[in-house]
């Protein structure tokens, strides 16, 4: 009986000591050591990790409250040499949804997004140091075939974008300028036969558009702005 009482007291003392050792600050008031915070009004953890004189170090875990239970939603591994962190976002089942580098709140460098219930890459993107999309963005079907290819400059669509069928056939080909459709556009069916072609001008169809069936031109439509004539006085 005495041993049981001593064991209970030891557990209580251990918890008290541990509680005193977490959520501490240094002489300058900066967070230092192990920190752990719960969701308000609950005993469910919201985040936990370690600070070194105000700087996050090592692994941090972040949770969401799901049915009043903490569920791990993100893991950040902080770099000791700078403010960057390698981040993995997780589903409620623990599967990695996306992963890449962050500096503060900005995505930086290569980011990978995964298909649901699969470890196959769904989207591959690249960000600059300002968190803006740069260069080629690729979207994949589950079997690894490219579904979409686009190009970005400073976070905006620029140049040619293409969409593909599961068999790798081009279905659409557009030209963008400063995030707007601007230039020639072509639509195809799954047999790679041309369905329609024309031009966009600042996001709107412009000029003569041609439409096809079975490779034959079937109709044309002119999207040119009508000429307004002033009435004679």
Where are these predicted regions, by residue range?
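Bacterial Sec-dependent N-terminal signal peptides
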Residues: 1-23
